[in-house]
A protein has these predicted regions:
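Glycine-rich beta-alpha loop segments
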Residues: 24-32, 36
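A structural signal for small-residue-enriched, beta-sheet-centric alpha/beta enzyme cores
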Residues: 80-81, 110-277
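Gly/Ser/Thr-rich loops at beta-strand to alpha-helix junctions
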Residues: 33-41, 86, 113-117
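Proline-aspartate-enriched helix->loop->beta-strand connector
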Residues: 100, 105-106
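Conserved active-site and cofactor/substrate-binding residues in soluble primary-metabolism enzymes
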Residues: 4, 8, 42, 46, ...
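Extended, charged alpha/beta regions that create polyanion-binding interfaces
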Residues: 1-25
Length: 278
């Protein structure tokens, strides 16, 4: 599954680069955002550990007059892990802006861990966009935005949700509870409630009970919209300090797999010479 995902992701990234009219010889700066000392936030730095960087080789060859010895099937790539302001005392954007101004890459790829709004998305999806990224915004610690408008070069942001807050966990629990109730009532023709396990492959939406049933079991909370429920839960949990940010207990091994997946896909997409055999 990881290999299949890597192949699909690398192909989609190639298409994205083509869509942005980024040429094969365009220089790239890969930025790994996040705190390397906090596992679920270390996606960016971990990805950089396996990125093939070549900019220094081009610089050395240029000084020694040996550019003709460089394999043009390897793009000029550099990498940067700016850390977080709590460790460096410097705004992440300022570090990136300075490096971009000095090295002048043609485009940026920024990798970061995200906060999910649903438990089902944690470590299960890859987000890719050309609209930039605001570091820390998912956990209420918004920093200055990193995008094409502010830096003057195309910015492709890649993220994987690795954490989720208690509001989302509680919201999803209520939603799943309602679907369990709906399934039980449907199987018993509405005469008796008896819980049974829902298969992960089931279409859960089909089990969502009617508004009247939701109100019967949960009162006014049962008829609130998704956003209204989120807002209510946030108003209850946040002031009490209970809106914790959580991550799966298997995060160490999953981060190792996910970071390797992303770095391998980036290497294939950025360097035409690189291929992975099945």
């Amino acid at each position: 599954k990881l290999e299949e995902t890597r192949e699909v992701f690398s192909e989609e990234l190639k298409k994205f680069l083509s869509y942005k009219k980024i040429k094969e010889d365009a220089t790239c700066l890969v930025v790994g955002l996040g705190n390397e000392y906090i596992t679920p936030d270390a996606l960016g730095p971990m990805v950089l550990n396996n990125i093939i960087v070549t900019r220094h080789l081009y610089e050395m060859a240029n000084r020694q007059g040996g550019l003709d010895q460089i394999d043009v099937n390897y793009r000029k790539v550099s990498a940067l892990a700016p850390g977080v302001m709590g460790l460096t005392g410097i705004e992440t954007y300022d570090i990136i802006e300075s490096v971009v101004g000095k090295t002048k890459p043609d485009f940026l790829i920024v990798v970061d861990a995200l906060a999910a709004r649903a438990v089902s998305r944690v470590n299960k999806m890859i987000q890719m966009t050309d609209t930039g990224i605001s570091p820390g915004s998912g956990v209420g610690n918004k920093r200055r935005r990193i995008d094409e408008k502010s830096l003057g070069v195309p910015v492709i942001a890649i993220g994987i949700p690795t954490v989720v807050d208690a509001v989302s966990v509680t919201h999803d629990t209520i939603d799943l509870l309602m679907k369990h109730i709906g399934q039980s009532l449907a199987e018993k023709n509405g005469t008796q409630l008896e819980f049974s396990s829902l298969d992960k492959d089931d279409d859960l939406e089909q089990y969502l009970p009617t508004e009247a049933v939701r109100k019967e079991f949960l009162g006014k909370i049962g008829v609130l919209s998704k956003e209204e429920k989120r807002q209510l839960l946030a108003e209850v949990l946040t002031p009490a300090g209970y809106n914790l940010i959580v991550t799966p207990k298997t995060i160490d091994s999953e981060m190792a797999d996910l970071s390797r997946l992303v770095s391998n896909a980036l290497n294939v997409a950025l360097h035409p010479r690189i291929e992975f055999s099945a």
